[in-house]
Regions:
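CheY-like receiver
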Residues: 10, 136-197
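A short, hydrophobic beta-strand element within the central beta-sheet of small alpha/beta folds
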Residues: 18, 88-101
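Two-component/phosphorelay signaling modules centered on CheY-like receiver
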Residues: 24-48
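Alpha4 helix (beta4-alpha4-beta5 surface) of REC/receiver domains from two-component response regulators
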Residues: 31-32, 76, 101-116, 142, ...
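Acidic, metal-coordinating helix/loop segments flanking the phosphotransfer/catalytic sites
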Residues: 44-62, 66
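Active-site residues of response regulator receiver
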Residues: 66-68, 98
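Short amphipathic alpha-helix used as the core "switch/output" element in two-component signaling
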Residues: 68, 73-89
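C-terminal output helix
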Residues: 122-131, 135, 139, 143-144
Length: 197
């Protein structure tokens, strides 16, 4: 993934942001990071109940939530927000922060409807990259019985326009790989033929 351009100008001054973390030091660090990005309108929440109240009262532009808290989790809040009828907040970009990035936690973040998961300790440049990515992406929102959130079919979409990343190369490599049926029949799919030329 391309790093955030230090010379790029992004105005986050009007972005209304909800920070959810029950750890006073954790929320203090988040406040310092996002205010350095220029964000001025912050709602600091130390519980899901407080975050739900804020989501019911204010129109939010960004949510940054700690995955694991004493009595609940950021996963629970994002899942609740996606399923409750609080437009436009139900569609607000949500980033989950976690110190444990096992596959099970990444799946949990994806399945709750989060846009991204970021590993702790949080690097300001990585968090800014994810915020910019979310601002540029145009993944459709999906709502069904088992999932509500941004379209999870990520790998085949590649990164947003203007950003380089591993996924674009993966997509090209996938196009150049023959499909199993084509290998057996000796036929070369049109997309593969174009990729090889």
């Amino acid at each position: 993934m391309a790093e955030a351009n230090p010379k790029a100008r992004v105005n986050l001054e009007r972005a209304v942001t909800l920070l959810l973390d029950d750890n006073p030091e954790g929320i203090s660090i988040l406040v310092q990071i996002v205010t350095a990005f220029g964000i001025k309108s912050l709602h600091r929440c130390t519980s899901i109940e407080a975050a739900q109240e804020v989501a019911g009262q204010y129109e939010l532009d960004l949510i940054v939530a700690n995955a694991n808290m004493r009595d609940s989790s950021g996963y629970d809040f994002v899942s609740w927000l996606r399923r409750v009828n609080l437009e436009p907040n139900s569609f607000t970009p949500a980033i989950i922060l976690t110190g444990h990035t096992q596959v099970s936690n990444v799946r949990k973040a994806r399945d709750c409807g989060a846009n991204f998961i970021v590993a702790k300790p949080v690097s300001p440049s990585v968090l800014l990259e994810r915020i910019l990515w979310v601002a540029r992406e145009s993944r459709p929102f999906v709502a069904c019985d088992t999932y509500v959130g941004p379209d999870r079919r990520y790998k085949d979409m590649g990164p947003p326009e203007g950003m380089e990343g591993r996924r674009r190369e993966d997509k090209l490599a996938k196009a150049a790989t023959p499909a199993p049926a084509a290998e057996e029949s000796g036929e070369v799919p049109e997309a593969q033929a174009k990729a090889v030329q």
